[in-house]
Amino acid sequence: MQLKRISLISAALVAAPAAAFAQSTVQIYGTLNVDIESVEATGSATGALGSNFQSRSRVTSNSSNLGFRGTEDLGQGLRAFYQIESQVNLDNGSQGGAFWASRNSGVGLIGGWGQVLLGQWDSPYKVSTVRIDPTGDVGILGYSGIIGSTGAVTAGQGGQTFAERASFERRVANVIQYWSPTWRGLTGRLAYGTGDTNVGSTANGVSEASGLRPALYSGMVSFESGGWYATVSAERHKDFQPFNTLFAAPQSSGHDDGYKAGVQYSFNSTWSLGAVAEHLKYHADNISGLGAFERKITNWYVVGKYNVGPHSVALSYGQKGEEKLSGAGFSDLPDSKANQITARYGYSLSKRTSLYAFATRINNDANAFQTFGNSPITATQLFRDPARGADPTGFGLGMIHTF
């Protein structure tokens, strides 16, 4: 009997570590962010019929999402993790962009050396400054109306249109990322997006028959201490080709580069000030047989936020610089500046539920066509959204619930 008892204890001790290693955690989470808003874009420089977007009301589901994530302890300081996050269109229930794992989703490993993931995820360039925007770059208030933009909507799936291929606010498909551990407030991320051109006829809108192989390289470094946050980031898009489609010309090799810096200071959770500056450069090696072509733009953004009790107020201003064009017979594009002014008031009903009111306006010069980056107005002219010189304006009321 004593021998049997000892055997049972021994078996339990052997099984215990294996059971512990197999334990995992699973979390179901989500954000429901819906508003009713009035939007318009008037004042088009073209004067053509249909070049303006007349005022109308709409209900918008601003990046609402549902997700599942978890970890598994593998022992010896190593863990596996996963996340499956999908967009939820509460405004109309459509599946446009709202399919399984359509948002940040992946699987990977975490250790003392940092973590690595495979899947689809926001680029380090995008992540580096998104926290400086009080909205998290959501809806018509998002700073991607200016930052990361050339009059382009954000790219959720690596990009299939001109506008998306030109954007530097990207969720990158077919990506491998490395995130470093934090050391004395310093941390970094690196990413490589494959472009996945080996199967099918197109990737990122580039024909496989052209022989080009699109790829993305992105990296960031950030420092956080006390109330300070500072970051620098860079990103290159190889052969994304946002130009030749305009001229119906044979596609040629090229690259697009983005460089960005951001800083934020927060004081006692009462107020915060932030600023972002970036330089975007688009380069085609040989456009329409006329030689190399470059397009350069400098954008910047400033924001202030004040919190008192359940109330919060945020004001922001962003500006897109004039476009500098060179090569292939092009010269600088005059009247191509734009700016965006945004105001937002929030009221917290609880830790997970809040109401908000907002207003925003983008002022486009005659040759500019900036639009709301994450909730654009319907396209009216070629890839331009809205028409050249039209000024998108919006205001409304909304509600956010998280779980």
Predicted regions and their residues:
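Outer membrane beta-barrel
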Residues: 24-37, 54-196, 221-226, 360-364
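Membrane-embedded beta-strand positions in outer-membrane beta-barrel channels/transporters
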Residues: 65-67, 104-106, 175-177, 218-220, ...
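Structural signature of outer-membrane beta-barrel channels/translocons
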Residues: 15, 69-73, 110-112, 179-184, ...
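Transmembrane beta-strands of outer-membrane beta-barrel proteins
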Residues: 26-34, 76, 80-84, 116, ...
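Detector for outer-membrane/organellar transmembrane beta-barrel domains
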Residues: 212, 217-347, 359-361
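Gram-negative bacterial Sec-dependent N-terminal signal peptides
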Residues: 1-22
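Outer-membrane beta-barrel "beta-signal"
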Residues: 387-403
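Gram-negative outer-membrane beta-barrel proteins
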Residues: 36-44, 88-94, 124-128, 196-200, ...
